[in-house]
């Protein structure tokens, strides 16, 4: 097939997108596909024309315009199949303030939060206690994520978010271990337990620096806890109207309470990223995972 590989973009996660796309291109070519790159570095001009002349689009964008559903809407207009979720599900999952309301309404635990659409007053306090996390309302890869332990650290953390993003989310830090779990098709994958380096948390540096975190797959959890993580992951995937694949990130508290932090509709896709690790645990190497995502995308498009 002629595959349009969409990567890069204008978000703060551009470099991550391009790095992952190189491995995807290699896998696509190994599968026998012809690959053309499309990089919406500053705009989406030309995407409709490019998509119309290709059999499939593989999206590897992070943040806008890929995770917010804009590219998916344009591909739908062009009649070009693609992997993963459609426009509505993509938007719902990317917008933490919206997705957290939906998840909580349906009984899925998620940390309390304060949403900010603009810089607050200098003396603003979220009333959530300390420590807490400050992060962009829309975005991934833990960019601009700050752990704030004292009130005087709140304003600089918010400024770091608003310097790059238009909206912020503030959440209390919940003590526990970090767990992530992917979905492929209609199946939850084996969860991963993440142990950041001593004294750190799983931020952008931990994710993309060798040795920044230890990722244990499958997670060394009791069978009933693993089953619970997988059940909640599938429920969240379906509640948000997602398809193809996704990845849910959690904090598992010592008492067994499982708090869903966010759901990613375009999770990292380097061969050593989290979802590819989980797929490998069930016998799918990286090219086989890419082939499965294409198959799911073609099926969703009725091809």
From Swiss-Prot:
Chain residues that bind Mg(2+) 2: 262, 264
GO BP of this protein: cell wall organization; peptidoglycan biosynthetic process; regulation of cell shape
The keyword Ligase is assigned to this record: yes
Leader peptide range in chain numbering: none
Entry EC no(s): 6.3.2.4
Required cofactor names: Mg(2+); Mn(2+)
The protein's name: D-alanine--D-alanine ligase
Organism: Nitratidesulfovibrio vulgaris (strain DP4)
Gene label: ddl
């Amino acid at each position: 097939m002629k595959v349009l590989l969409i990567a890069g973009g204008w978000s703060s996660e551009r470099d991550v997108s391009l790095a992952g796309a190189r491995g995807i291109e290699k896998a696509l070519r190994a599968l026998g596909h012809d690959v053309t790159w499309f990089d919406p570095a500053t705009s989406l001009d030309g995407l409709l024309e490019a998509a119309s002349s290709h059999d499939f689009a593989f999206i590897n964008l992070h943040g806008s315009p890929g995770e917010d559903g804009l590219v998916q809407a344009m591909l739908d207009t062009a009649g070009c199949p693609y992997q993963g979720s459609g426009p509505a599900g993509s938007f719902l999952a990317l917008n933490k303030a919206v997705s957290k309301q939906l998840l909580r309404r349906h009984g899925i635990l998620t940390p309390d939060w304060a949403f900010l659409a603009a810089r607050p007053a200098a003396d603003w306090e979220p009333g959530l206690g300390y420590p807490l996390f400050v992060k962009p309302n829309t975005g991934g890869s833990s960019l601009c994520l700050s752990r704030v332990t004292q009130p005087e650290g709140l304003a600089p953390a918010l400024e770091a978010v608003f310097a790059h993003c238009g909206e912020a989310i503030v959440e209390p830090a919940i003590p526990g271990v970090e767990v992530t779990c992917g979905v492929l098709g209609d199946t939850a994958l084996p969860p991963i337990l993440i142990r950041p380096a001593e004294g750190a948390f799983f931020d952008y540096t931990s994710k993309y620096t060798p040795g920044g975190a230890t990722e244990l797959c499958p997670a060394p959890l009791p069978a009933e806890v693993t089953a619970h993580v997988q059940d909640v992951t599938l429920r969240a995937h379906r509640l948000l109207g997602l398809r193809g694949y996704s990845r849910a990130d959690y904090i598992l508290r010592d008492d067994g309470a499982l708090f869903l932090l966010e759901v990613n509709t375009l999770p990292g896709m380097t061969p050593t990223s989290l979802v590819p690790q989980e797929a490998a645990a069930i016998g799918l190497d990286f090219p086989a995972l890419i082939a499965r995502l294409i198959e799911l995308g073609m099926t969703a498009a009725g091809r």
